Amino acid sequence: MNWTGLYTLLSGVNRHSTAIGRVWLSVIFIFRIMVLVVAAESVWGDEKSSFICNTLQPGCNSVCYDQFFPISHVRLWSLQLILVSTPALLVAMHVAHQQHIEKKMLRLEGHGDPLHLEEVKRHKVHISGTLWWTYVISVVFRLLFEAVFMYVFYLLYPGYAMVRLVKCDVYPCPNTVDCFVSRPTEKTVFTVFMLAASGICIILNVAEVVYLIIRACARRAQRRSNPPSRKGSGFGHRLSPEYKQNEINKLLSEQDGSLKDILRRSPGTGAGLAEKSDRCSAC
């Protein structure tokens, strides 16, 4: 499995994340993916071939292994990491869409040179507005995926300690046979480590949701106490609702002033326009 591509995609999200989000990404890639790739896959690499039962009945080893280990630990953790990391791509797509809109606005304003467009790509997007909702939803989905996989792991493998010996009486085994698990101590250590890392990620996700909500409430309270001025700088300001509303009001005022000048210069035309408007309103 190629984890480098996933890391490259999520590194772009890391630029626009909170401090807690950056810590979460470090835990994901250093304490989980690196351990999974470097150590855990080698420990579980020979799990099926080294699962030996004290019988020569054909097929008994396979059915006993499937009964006690329906899903490999490594494959379950790999699927968990992929699904947990996927919601962060929503933030990356939202940021890319927002930057595309900024570039489009710059071109319409006559600032479409490569220098300005590159500056839009480099600057950090603030987590506010619709991006705030996208970010919170992605964190909530991460939290749900972590909790669901922890519960699935508990259902599949009660307890965290890897057993050394299991007794199996599933057909086609002739009777109750003893089956031996390879490297039980190593597997127990890595299982505890991965479950602890998953628990840390759950705590980080909860803390990030609380932090985002508190910061959003603080910003709203600050806006009510100190209303923002009409002036602003930066590309992020150009996408704010206040900026858009100011631009619309400016265009409407300019059009209103132009219409008044036309009516003042040619009263006949103004009367005709008024008559047409009355007819339209009557219709």
Swiss-Prot record:
Effect of M34K: In CMTX1; localized to the endoplasmic reticulum
Family under the similarity heading: Belongs to the connexin family. Beta-type (group I) subfamily.
Lineage: Eukaryota, Metazoa, Chordata, Craniata, Vertebrata
Phenotype for C168R: In CMTX1; demyelinating form
Spans through the membrane: 23-45, 76-95, 131-153, 192-214
Outcome recorded upon mutating M34I: In CMTX1; localized in the Golgi apparatus but also forming rare small junction-like plaques
Keyword field: Cell junction, Cell membrane, Charcot-Marie-Tooth disease, Dejerine-Sottas syndrome, Disease variant, Gap junction, Membrane, Neurodegeneration, Neuropathy, Phosphoprotein, Transmembrane, Transmembrane helix
Reported impact of R75W: In CMTX1; localized in the Golgi apparatus without reaching the cell membrane
Phosphoserine PTM sites in chain numbering: S233, S258, S266, S277
Quaternary structure annotation from Swiss-Prot or TrEMBL: A connexon is composed of a hexamer of connexins. Interacts with CNST.
Pathological association: Charcot-Marie-Tooth disease, X-linked dominant, 1: A form of Charcot-Marie-Tooth disease, a disorder of the peripheral nervous system, characterized by progressive weakness and atrophy, initially of the peroneal muscles and later of the distal muscles of the arms. Dejerine-Sottas syndrome: A severe degenerating neuropathy of the demyelinating Charcot-Marie-Tooth disease category, with onset by age 2 years. Characterized by motor and sensory neuropathy with very slow nerve conduction velocities, increased cerebrospinal fluid protein concentrations, hypertrophic nerve changes, delayed age of walking as well as areflexia. There are both autosomal dominant and autosomal recessive forms of Dejerine-Sottas syndrome.
Function: One gap junction consists of a cluster of closely packed pairs of transmembrane channels, the connexons, through which materials of low MW diffuse from one cell to a neighboring cell.
Cytoplasmic topological domain: 1-22, 96-130, 215-283
Outcome after substituting R75P: In CMTX1; localized in the Golgi apparatus without reaching the cell membrane
Effect on the protein of changing V38M: In CMTX1; localized in the Golgi apparatus without reaching the cell membrane
Consequence of substituting R142W: In CMTX1; moderate
Official protein name in the record: Gap junction beta-1 protein
Listed result of changing M34T: In CMTX1; functional channel; localized in the Golgi apparatus without reaching the cell membrane
One GO CC term on file: endoplasmic reticulum membrane
GO molecular function: gap junction channel activity; identical protein binding
Entry's localization field: Cell membrane; Cell junction, Gap junction
GO biological process, one term: gap junction assembly
Alphabetical list of SMART domains matching this protein: CNX, Connexin_CCC
Taxonomic superkingdom: Eukaryota
Gene: GJB1
Membrane topology of the entry: Multi-pass membrane protein
